[in-house]
Design a protein with these regions (language model features):
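A fold-level detector for beta-propeller and closely related beta-sheet-rich head/sensor domains
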Residues: 1-157
Length: 157
């Protein structure tokens, strides 16, 4: 995990400052999503994003938020999808109020920004790479997962 600096008399370790429990040494929330009104710059909502389920020695589902290392992808229908957290989930949020409207468990860390594409069937798909990340300590993997967004007639946006 370190950086040898190739002959320098010192080295660095690039990782967050964590407690013995594997949790950040700062007061939660450790990660959140926020909606901002761009006409006046005011925060409209701020919601905790993530749990410590995959960070702590015990799988505790406390919603304290987790550090984010990837950005969201936003759909024209007003949804934001995030998978760049240190828990093994991809989540969908309603941009109007920041409420979580969907979530799926990933087989490994999804520390990346999701992608989206329009299929030949006319449906929109969300794609997540669950590859993990060695610096965050998440399990590594090699999964590429596609989720079909609901069609407009099924209540999709």
């Amino acid at each position: 995990m370190g950086n040898e600096n190739f002959g320098a008399p010192y080295a660095s370790i690039v990782k967050p400052f964590m407690s013995r429990l594997g949790l950040p040494c700062q007061q939660p929330p450790w990660g959140y999503i926020a909606g901002v009104d761009l006409t006046n710059g005011k925060t409209v909502y701020r919601r905790v994003n993530g749990t410590v389920r995959d960070m702590a020695p015990l799988p505790l589902p406390f919603k304290t938020g987790v550090p984010g290392i990837g950005g969201p992808i936003v759909t024209a229908g007003g949804l934001a999808f995030l998978s760049g957290t240190v828990d093994y989930y991809v989540r969908g949020y309603d941009l109007a109020d920041g409420q979580e409207v969907w979530r799926a468990r990933l087989p490994a860390g999804g520390q990346s920004t999701p992608a989206t594409y329009l299929g030949r069937d006319g449906r929109q798909y969300l794609v997540v790479v669950a590859g993990g990340h060695r610096y965050t300590g998440t399990k590594t993997g090699d999964s590429v997962i596609a989720y079909a967004l609901p069609a407009a007639k099924e209540g999709g946006r």
